[in-house]
A protein has these predicted regions:
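Internal helix-turn-beta structural module
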Residues: 139-207
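Conserved small/polar residues in nucleotide/adenosyl-binding loops
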Residues: 209-211
């Protein structure tokens, strides 16, 4: 948990303007909101005590600016959603919006998810997971997102967490949307990471730094 917190702290200091993901089948640029917050596993309860709500955990995560996604991304692991196993997902974005989504298996399920749910044509989370992570090294697909998301970098279709921007927990729905946080009734993670993926942070001055 300390290593993850250190990674989150470093990213929070950087305040990258965007992230650029490249890998076979992926070339995606995601804008990040101003004053975005990278979070790690640790949480603090009402008594001020630290605890880990998710075990195991390997991720640091924030929300992308839902209005700023350009390019395409391909999944690297199966997704279990609503009793369906979905494989080979490819998503194409223009101006933040999903304009096309296909899957080698479960194609219609993904199309229905994206095009029939409010706010599901945009992203609500981007999470960085080291490769290899202990879950990925196990070689096991658990078909349970809380486990499988710790195997690789992932994105989430749908709602962003309010805490992904400074002060967001106190924001109204309208203020969250104005800050770039997607509002939706769904939140579905899908895994995109691999040993072949590179992620570069892009600063406001367009300079870049390798992040993962």
């Amino acid at each position: 948990a300390a290593i993850l917190k250190s990674k989150a702290d470093t990213l929070n200091k950087e305040q990258f303007s965007a992230l650029h993901y490249t890998a076979p089948g992926t070339d995606l640029t995601l804008g990040l909101p101003k004053n975005h917050v990278w979070e790690s596993a640790g949480a603090i309860n009402a008594q001020g005590e630290s605890f880990l709500p998710n075990m195991p955990t390997e991720e640091v995560f924030t929300a992308p600016d839902f209005r700023r996604a350009e390019g395409y991304v391909t999944s690297t692991k199966p997704l279990s959603y609503n009793g369906n196993i979905i494989e080979g997902i490819k998503v194409t974005f223009e101006s933040g919006e999903i304009v096309d989504i296909t899957a080698e298996k479960g194609d219609q399920v993904m199309k229905d998810l994206v095009f029939k749910n409010k706010g599901a044509r945009a992203l609500g989370e981007c999470a960085l997971v080291p490769d290899p992570s202990p879950i990925s090294q196990s070689g096991i697909t658990f078909f349970n997102t809380l486990f499988d998301e710790n195997a690789s970098n992932h994105l989430a279709i749908g709602a962003a967490y309010a805490t992904s921007v400074e002060g967001g927990a106190e924001f109204t729905e309208e203020e969250l949307e104005a800050a770039g946080l997607n509002r939706s009734d769904v939140h579905v993670d899908f895994m995109i990471g691999s040993s072949q993926m590179d992620i570069d942070g892009i600063r406001e001055d367009r300079s870049e730094e390798h992040t993962s």
